[in-house]
Amino acid sequence: MKALVSRLDSFGDVLLAGPAVRAVAARADHVTLLCGSRGAPAARLLPGVDEVLVWEAPWGGFEPPAVRRDDIDALVERIDADTALVLTSFHQSPLPTALVLRLAGVGYIAADSVDYPGSLLDLRHRRAPRAHEAEAALDLAEAAGFPRPDDGRLRVRTPPPAAAVTGPGPYVVLHPGASVPARAWSPERAAEAVRELAAAGHRVLVTGGPGERDLTAHVAGRHGTDLGGRTDAPELAGVLAGAAVVVTGNTAPAHLAAAVGTPVVSLFAPVVPAERWRPYGVPHVLLGDQDAPCADSRARDCPVPGHPCLNTVTATDVAAAVEKLLGET
């Protein structure tokens, strides 16, 4: 059986699909993961994925492309699957993707759907209220005939050794960036946290992507080690795997840390619900006002002056959370 799993949004979303992908892989001969370009690096980390098919959907992402008939026709020609799971967040519809899969001749399609699917779905599944994204995907997979083959935790392929980047000895990682501004702690607070953690005797590595070098340099200052722009996705997985604790917002590195089994201090902006997006399957401490006015708004930019949901969190709060997790592990 050739199976396809679709998760068209971001890096972290694709990581959260990982347990469901493994469930499919346990029964299928070949698994294709259909994802967007932001999710592709995560897709290549997932055990059970044989092929990654990258496509930018006009109904997803921060800057969706225009609808082009030739683009959709080209995707239809590339899809070769007998069965498919369409994984979406609770606020997204699977039906546009299901239509493309039907046009490609996929015989069995399953998805969570609030909307009436007509003939687009063979299994219209109902998501459990308040289910975590990883659990919701596993539930759908099981309903479609792919039971859990293992403990259902997040996993990635074994990352490369990171000692050449991290140096020797224990360390804490602080990742100050986020996919959207509403989910980011202020750089000043992050820099204070680096200083406070260093004063407590921790070696602090500050991570970030190629476009975040100015941010990571500012946050690391004289007390942290700046790794901004120095790691690709597998290398970042290795850095996070070696950390005692990772401090980050509700963004991709939180899920990557969970996938390598590292405890997380989660600076969680409630623009999306923590019950669905918190670090999954690892010890974690959730910081941030979950009842702030921005709650459940899915805002990209904070709609409340001063960003109080996160900026009321202090460096001392973060340092205390790190010590709590270290005491538990």
Model-derived regions: residue spans:
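Catalytic machinery of carbohydrate-active enzymes
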Residues: 1-329
